[in-house]
Amino acid sequence: MNKNIVILGTQWGDEGKGKVVDCLTKDSSYVVRYQGGHNAGHTLVVNDKKIILHLIPSGLLHKNVIGIIANGVVVSPFELIKEIKMLETHNIFVHKRLFISNSSPLILQYHIEMDIAREKKLGISALGTTGRGIGPAYEDKIARRALRIGDLKNEKTLSIRLEKIVNYYNHQLVSFYKHKPVDYKIILRDLLPTIDLIYDMIKDTTSILHTAIQSNKKIIFEGAQGSFLDIDHGTYPYVTSSNSTIGGVITGTGVGSKSLDYILGVTKAYSTRVGYGPFPTELFDDVDKHFSKKGHEFGSTTGRKRRTGWLDAVALCRSVRINSLSGLCITKLDVLDGLHEIKICTAYKNINTLEIISFPDIDEWKNIEPIYETYPGWNKKTLGIKKLIDLPYEARNYINRIEEITQIPVDIISTGPDRSDIIFVRDIFFIKK
């Protein structure tokens, strides 16, 4: 039996991981966020109510589940408290079953101001960050100057270290970026009241997870963003600041690779991307309008319109290999309903050399042309279908072709936004390794 399951995105984020996590954690004991921050946006629809989570693990909507925000996550205490209070309006109370790693770096106002100042100075060369301070917070971690969640437990030390780091940031903000400075006293004043609200949640989460594994508890590891936003394996520099591929699970939790039983890659039935960066299958036609309208392709974190395109199987296959995926979950299959034909990108061609490229360098992307296979679409609605056999023949053929190209099984298919709109082809908890 598979106890410990990783769920991660195979594209550029927004694949629908939150819903999949929500569906699988009803039978689990723990759900763990291991990287990213509140730049993630996991949208769940429960009883026709939309709930968007940016920081708290999606599986906490189930009242029997314990949530972990592990050491790989950068945490804004203000955003965390805001989410906790939002969940309480839905009668979901998490104070006694949510734990935060004492090693998680803090996101504070100076990170946000630095993020905004940099994007403004870059102008048309901006990376398109969410402006929430994620990158600067990870920089502090790597530079070994970060304030961490555990520092909140010692007010005197916190005050001294905070003043030093505010001075460091203000020197850059004012002198180089010509940006307004931040006020150390205001940051400290606003931060102190948050301590009492989350004090009891601050734990050594690595030890909690080790104990859970030794006790044979089921654990879901919930990824944020997608594989091609990974700082090392993504379309650099148009990436996030953390490891959103499988390596982020290990470093971001302290759980060893041998403890991971099954790795599920979540992919849309087509492709989307928010912000700048390479996107070889991008569309600018009526199909783009179809995807945007029917798929509601607007970012849950930024509200920006997502770029849309056909499924990129070259990128998907690379993601399969990078993450050692056990199986796939195809989401938003219903968005393809009504299309006359459907395409899959199976190779990249350099338009100058006509050479087939496995995965381009950053300067090569502009010369890449996708090579497509074309398949017939379907007119029957797939929305809400719960059995594989009930899908139209053409839809099943499309799924089969994805399995052939990637050489791994499609174990789950999402056919709509509600948590009940799902096909479990195989029970991933009981698939033999």
Curated annotation (Swiss-Prot):
Family: Belongs to the adenylosuccinate synthetase family.
One GO cellular component, as annotated: cytoplasm
Binding residues for GTP: 13-19, 41-43, 306, 332-334, 414-416
Catalytic activity: IMP + L-aspartate + GTP = N(6)-(1,2-dicarboxyethyl)-AMP + GDP + phosphate + 2 H(+)
Coiled-coil region(s): none
SMART domains named in the record: Adenylsucc_synt (SM00788)
Record function comment: Plays an important role in the de novo pathway of purine nucleotide biosynthesis. Catalyzes the first committed step in the biosynthesis of AMP from IMP.
Lineage summary: Bacteria, Pseudomonadati, Pseudomonadota, Gammaproteobacteria, Enterobacterales
Cofactor(s) needed for function: Mg(2+)
Assembly: Homodimer.
TM regions (residue ranges): none
Catalytic center residues: 14 (proton acceptor), 42 (proton donor)
Family annotation (NCBIfam families): PRK01117.1, purA
Location(s) in or outside the cell: Cytoplasm
Cofactor binding description: Binds 1 Mg(2+) ion per subunit.
Matching Pfam families: Adenylsucc_synt
Keyword Ligase: yes
Keyword terms: Cytoplasm, GTP-binding, Ligase, Magnesium, Metal-binding, Nucleotide-binding, Purine biosynthesis
Key word Magnesium present: yes
EC category name: ligase
Protein name: Adenylosuccinate synthetase
Annotated PROSITE patterns: ADENYLOSUCCIN_SYN_1 (PS01266), ADENYLOSUCCIN_SYN_2 (PS00513)
EC number: 6.3.4.4
Binding site for substrate: 300-306
One of the GO biological process terms: IMP metabolic process
Annotated gene: purA
